[in-house]
Amino acid sequence: MSFRINTNIAALNAHSIGVQTNRNIAGSLEKLSSGLRINKAADDASGMAIADSLRSQSESLGQAVRNANDAIGMIQIADKAMDEQLKILDTIKAKAIQAAQDGQSQESRRSLQSDIRRLMEELDNIANTTSFNGQQMLSGAFTNKEFQIGAYSNTTVKASIGPTSSDKIGHIRMETASFSGVGMLASAGGNNLTEVALNFKATDGVNSFELENVRISTSAGTGIGALSEVINRFSDKLGIRATYNVMATGTSPVMSGTVRGLVINGVRIGTVNEVRKNDSDGRLINAINSVKNQTGVEASLDITGRINLVSLDGRAISVHADGEASHVFGEGNFTGISGNNHAIVGRLTLIRTDARDIIVSGVNFSHIGLHSAQGVAETTANLRQLRGMFGADIASAAGANANKAQADINRQGIGAGVTSLKGAMIVMDMVDSARTQLDKVRSDMGSVQIQLVSTINNISTTQVNVKAAESQIRDVDFAAESANFSKNNILAQSGSFALAQANAVQQNVLRLLQ
């Protein structure tokens, strides 16, 4: 056993351990007071780097959620505005339907048109004023807008909102055969004209659609009325709707005289004696209408005294009479019927509720006037034109000049909006087209909103998991650290006692010197 005075090894060891224990106590107190296991890089260098990366990712995901919520807010603003526009369109259509009956006077139709014009102004006002943070939402400028929805660059969602102003929606394409089709009967007493098969090109942008053959004749269940039914049966595939008008009009007022051997559509009416000028007593009209259920043709007089024959079901109209009948009916007989062995087929109108062209071909389709050599009255209109006058181009393309031999675009228009029966029909088509366009825009916005909601749910879940991973690395385990602090506290107390004992041992040297 040796005793040294200059170097107290035991005391030095006790001191060194005590210093380390105090350092550990300080570290424990720092962790317990901050709640963090890593307070500085020295605590866990690699762990700190990972935790910092996770914290950055979590904060970025939080901002991404806020971005997505901003996008949803913008979409909801536009959606509610468009919902109001759709309500306006519903009201306009209801007023157009109200105007589309001849019980309305011209004055009442003008009142309805005035209401519609006000509604149109509000529709455009909504389109021009709906905005978010200074950005116009419904003007068409909100296109391919990107929203960052991830923690890393180029993780975006794109959103576009189409224009909803009246000049950008409600497009309809109208085409009407320029000539009211005229066919040659097999014989003066026959009724067969031809068979027509139509082929509509690129109805869906790519494919064509061929319709079944339809017989064009003066018999029931044939003619362009039957052809229109076939077209409308497949309107969902074609995107095209058909209307027709089969009318024969005298070229001049009815003159006095006797009509002998009158035959309409193969049904013999016989002789109508002593017809008065302008058929003032109605005997000619009554004679023709007495067999209208057999002929499918109804007669009336217009305000000029000309006789009008209208096909009730769209079959062709043929008229045969002897001798001076042409003088009675009006010189030159009926518009479009130049002889007793001819029949008027009528005029077919095709309407498409978008701006695409109507491309049609087929077998014998020239017999119904749809031939480039004959010419087709055609135009594209939009909802904005509802605020003004429907000009001659719209009137002709919509078949408004049905009682004319040729749908001449130089003829007069049909007035403003619903101020005419035909105009009211056009307004209904425009509104239907506008509704379809707005519903498509809303549907696209709804899809984006669903995507954003799903993204928010996913990001929120990811953010929670990232925060949990960061917490596992950065946050302190209070139970373990409290136990560690208690251990170090006890060690500090025992170390102080040990250091005191180590210093006391050196006093034994004095005993040796006594």
From Swiss-Prot:
It comes from Helicobacter mustelae. Pfam families: Flagellin_C (PF00700), Flagellin_IN (PF07196), Flagellin_N (PF00669). Heteromer of FlaA and FlaB. FlaB is located proximal to the hook while the remainder of the filament is composed of the predominant FlaA. It is found in: Secreted; Bacterial flagellum. Keywords: Bacterial flagellum, Secreted, Virulence. The keyword Heme does not apply. The keyword Nucleotidyltransferase does not apply. This is Flagellin B. GO terms for cellular component: bacterial-type flagellum; extracellular region. Belongs to the bacterial flagellin family. Flagellin is the subunit protein which polymerizes to form the filaments of bacterial flagella. Important for motility and virulence. One of its GO terms (molecular function) is structural molecule activity. Its main location: secreted. The gene is flaB. It comes from the Bacteria. PANTHER family: FLAGELLIN.
